[in-house]
Amino acid sequence: MKDTIRQLIQQALTQLVNDGVLPEGLSPAIQVENARDKTHGDFASNIAMMLAKPAGMKPRDLAEKLINALPASADISKVEIAGPGFLNFFQNTDALANRLDAALADARLGVRKAGPSEKVVIDMSAPNLAKEMHVGHLRSTIIGDSVARVLEFLGDNVIRQNHVGDWGTQFGMLMAYLQENPITSDELSDLENFYRAAKKRFDESEEFATRARGLVVKLQAGDPECLALWTRFKDISLSHCQKTYELLNVKLTMADVMGESAYNDDLANVVADLKAKGLLVESQGAQCVFLEEFKNSEGEPLPVIVQKADGGYLYATTDLAAVRYRSNVLNADRALYFVDQRQALHFNQVFEVARRAGFVGHPMQMEHMGFGTMNGADGRPFKTRDGGTVKLIDLLTEAKERAYALVKEKNPSLTEAELRHIGEVVGIGAVKYADLSKHRTSDYSFNFELMLNFEGNTAPYLLYAYTRVAGVFRKLGKGFDEVEGNIVLQAAHEQDLAARLAQFGEILNNVADKGTPHVLCSYLYDLAGLFSSFYENCPILAAETLEQQQSRLRLAALTGRTLKQGLELLGLETLERM
């Protein structure tokens, strides 16, 4: 609808230029926002205030001329001037009802991407292997997953890449410890304790550390025995990751793994190409790129080190190789990096070096989608009581158990199987939604009590809201797609719900553009609240006429489908009963 209004305004501006009211050469960014007060319309634009000065007119006078120049539209019932010169647009309720009827008949709910379809790489999750995933991996994994789902729903070709840390000193450490302590595969499956023991030896024994580094050199040289051990450790670690992804209902598989080791063969070429471009400077034996845009507190350019004095490569080297691969091999239009916002400087530097070196041969937009920290109740990074890292699988298991106990208390008559299933859906959904509902760049405090509450902006509330809609149709013995008739908007609660339903596509395009799933969370929470008001004030099954009942059932059906689709795009399962 906003695009329709922008087009109408653009036609009016063209008319006013032709009439000599506005000077030629104007190309304003036409802004159309949702009106805050529905009594003053559904949408508002400040275009008259933006152009009043070049027009040499008062904003309200220009607004009046704009209204007179606006083409007639079946979508708009009237346009009014408000305040200093806002244009307030009232949408035609019949046209709105027709759009919703069309959305209900569409598998995609009438949602279309605002721009052309693109190929998008999503760099997400990326745990360091050789140990189990911890809570610090949650945000990259589920935010990246949600944005990937939205992009796919809008029609983009999404390539998920799990840039795991599968190379480096930690593997030499594990191999050295395994040589000292031969164990069975079953014992090795407890990778966390094995890693902890190896790290202790590495920190306490210089002889052990030297041996571990030597094994890394042998691994890098392709030693068959070291490669076999490395593969063994990597496979065990990835299997742990996959179990966590499946529990989280995240669309990541082994086929999506594109770890650091995948770029090993290109690292020397990256350095050579940077040198050929004249970008490298030797500093204390290391090969660096200095960028004037990035300086330290003394005003000196910061180095982007791509090769250490001992010949070793760094994260920047691998990331540059990945940029080149994603642009020139995958031919991606966008590459979205869901990595902690504390890495912003690193990625800004890498992206700039890649551009200068010509590594981005295919025009590719590189975006660091940074995120804040998940903290404990004390506002500090989430830790165990003894200060250790919390395994992600342990956190999710506790969430399931807490939700199970809560559901059992409320519904003791359910079978054990039903309780376990509902407990898992609610528990995992609660953890994910509590994270996704916060602005991506914000820190937040993890709180089981708040996220498992059935009131407020939580997963349990939204899951229950969906079951409430589903319950209406269960009583009828019908599905959402089995309601005849047409939507007719008369009551205010019907119109409010309808107006919000019509914004689903706009919301999803916003998420896709900015990588912000919290926008979708807020929308679904608002939609659930509007449905609750509609349900309480507009009888559905006890409607006065058949036509009214069918109309309200169709509104309910579209609400149910939108809630279900929205939750699915967040990576949350839904329940038909709770």
From Swiss-Prot:
Which PROSITE patterns is this protein grouped with?
AA_TRNA_LIGASE_I
Catalysed reaction equations from the record = tRNA(Arg) + L-arginine + ATP = L-arginyl-tRNA(Arg) + AMP + diphosphate
UniProt-listed Pfam families: Arg_tRNA_synt_N (PF03485), DALR_1 (PF05746), tRNA-synt_1d (PF00750)
GO BP of this protein: arginyl-tRNA aminoacylation
Q: Which UniProt keywords apply?
A: Aminoacyl-tRNA synthetase, ATP-binding, Cytoplasm, Ligase, Nucleotide-binding, Protein biosynthesis
An example Gene Ontology CC term for this record: cytoplasm
Task: Name the domain of life.
Answer: Bacteria
What terms describe the molecular function in GO for this protein?
A: arginine-tRNA ligase activity; ATP binding
EC number in record: 6.1.1.19
UniProt short sequence motif 'HIGH' region, positions renumbered to this chain? 127-137
List where in the cell it is found.
Answer: Cytoplasm
Where does the protein principally reside? cytoplasm
Which PANTHER family does the protein's record reference? ARGININE--TRNA LIGASE, CYTOPLASMIC, ARGINYL-TRNA SYNTHETASE
Instruction: Relate the assembly described in the record.
Output: Monomer.
Entry's family note: Belongs to the class-I aminoacyl-tRNA synthetase family.
User: What's the name of the protein?
Assistant: Arginine--tRNA ligase
